[in-house]
Design a protein with these regions (language model features):
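Membrane-embedded helix-loop-helix hairpins and adjacent transmembrane boundary segments
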Residues: 1-480
Length: 480
């Protein structure tokens, strides 16, 4: 029986899921014997495991709930902004083999590590600070999405958005702080299965059954929700997504964590392919909610982020509702844990150890667990201030994409890139992005566009002017 509200069984299923995630983290902690285990899982992951974690992570709370909310309010924009990220990820999967080779041959474990070996410690710290800021913002977007779901339970058991955010942080902290990337990867595989079965198959299929078939959906679809269009804001989002894929710290970490070059390329490619198949389904869930969920219910939740869980509650019977909401939580948590582990690595390995290079490994492991507690609290503050997952994500990514995307690509491939060029590019990209936002984004153009252009100009011109007098070390994994 469809019930239009949450039943005790649904709540029990959601609670059991959250407990299972914590237990996985506590069990897998036994595998963590070194920092290489904590950060990279011992470089031991094959293509299928990487496929699951890549797909689950890049969808995320903002990619599912946030983008479905965009589809609900703006229709085809949800697809227009997803396709550049998909294209960028396919391109990145082609780079993943080289990244894996560089990591294995030169002992590189992160993008800042690569920057240090090519451009020195200053470049490493600057990039590390950019990554830490971006990852915290991304974790905050997942806290917001999780809190939105838990807040939807508030009418049943009295949990507010704020308390939901605290619960989300607590779960993220426990299994990430204890088990590192091992815990992240193994929970991601479980979460991937939950996501595909109970979100991307169950909810769309049940929606069509409820409507009486695809014909009725098309007949009642508002034309403006299916009409492609583009404006300056969408262009900004497109550039942000595309450039971000070149320097997404979590994506580089997956390549470094692969057991070999082939696993890195295949895992990234298959995960991206699986993600691509979900894009039209997210749009469908966003727009079909207009036909199945009363508008006042969406409005009552206070955010269009609530569209997909509201749809699940509206159309699914007892038990399946709990599984669907657990599936939605799974994709959010998959993204949060991946970005959290990257932010922890950045703060401890890429920033702290620059100033304390002789830190013993045992102390470094303790510090990672301290930061795995502290950083989510910073994300919590952001989530309490900005309660829209998509807005938080685009705010954080715009700065990073403009300032770090092209320098990261240059560090991997361009022999003539120099320390001065990379630092100039990052400074120009970050500064112009801030200035453009402060000016109110003239012409309606997203800030990443002028920021990325400024970064490219500074990077290329300064590097060409300084490469002869101050060449950088080029890391070529093909040379013995």
């Amino acid at each position: 029986m469809v019930h239009n509200e949450l039943h005790a069984l649904d709540l029990a299923i959601i609670g059991a899921y959250l407990i299972a995630m914590v237990l996985i983290g506590l069990v897998v902690v036994k595998k963590v014997r070194s920092m290489d285990d904590y950060y990279l899982g011992g470089r031991s992951f094959g293509p299928l495991v990487l496929m699951a974690t890549v797909c689950a992570t890049i969808i995320g709370g903002s990619g599912l709930m946030g983008r479905a909310g965009v589809a609900y309010s703006s229709g085809f924009k949800a697809i227009m902004t997803a396709l550049p990220y998909l294209l960028g990820m396919f391109i990145f999967s082609g780079l993943a083999g080289r990244i894996s080779d560089v990591g294995t041959k030169f002992g590189v474990t992160s993008i800042p590590d690569l920057f240090e070996q090519r451009f020195g410690k200053t470049a490493k710290v600057v990039l590390g600070c950019l990554i830490a800021f971006t990852m915290m913002g991304t974790v905050a977007s997942q806290v917001t999405a999780t809190a939105t779901i838990i807040n939807m339970l508030g009418g049943e058991i009295g949990i507010s958005y704020e308390l939901g955010a605290l619960i989300a942080c607590a779960v993220f902290i426990i299994y990430t702080a204890t088990s590192g990337l091992f815990g992240v990867i193994y929970t991601d595989v479980f979460q991937f299965v939950m996501l595909i079965l109970f979100v991307y198959i169950l909810i769309p299929a049940s929606s069509l059954v409820k409507l009486g078939g695809i014909g009725n959906f098309v007949q009642n679809l508002a034309p403006e929700l299916a009409k492609p269009y583009i404006d300056g804001g969408i262009v900004g989002d497109i550039i942000t997504y595309f450039v971000f894929t070149l320097a997404g710290a979590e994506m580089w970490q997956w390549a470094f964590a692969a057991k070999n070059r082939r696993s890195a390329k295949e895992g990234l490619f298959l995960g991206t392919l699986a993600y691509g198949l979900t894009i039209p389904l997210v749009w469908f869930m966003g727009v079909v909610a207009h036909q199945l969920v009363p508008a006042e219910k969406i409005a009552a939740y206070g955010s269009t982020d609530a569209v997909v869980p509201a749809l699940a509650i509206e159309i699914l019977p007892v038990g399946l509702t709990g599984l669907a909401l657990a599936g939605i939580l799974s994709v959010i948590m998959s993204t949060a844990d991946s970005y959290l582990i990257v932010s922890v690595q950045t703060c401890v390995h890429d920033i702290y150890k620059v100033f304390r290079p002789d830190t013993p490994e045992r102390k470094e492991l303790r510090l990672t667990r301290v930061f795995a507690v502290v950083l989510p609290l910073g994300a919590l503050l952001i989530a309490l201030y900005i309660k829209n997952a998509y807005n938080i994500l685009m705010f954080a990514w715009s700065f990073y994409a403009a300032a770090a995307g092209l320098p990261a690509f240059a560090a991997l491939y361009w022999k003539k890139a120099t320390k001065a060029g990379v630092l100039s590019g990052m400074a120009a990209g970050f500064t112009v992005t801030i200035a453009w936002k402060l000016l109110g984004q003239p012409f309606g153009l997203g800030a990443t566009v002028p920021g990325a252009i400024a970064c490219a100009l500074a990077l290329v011109l300064v590097s060409l002017a300084t490469c002869k007098k101050h060449p950088s070390v080029y890391l070529d994994p093909r040379k013995a």
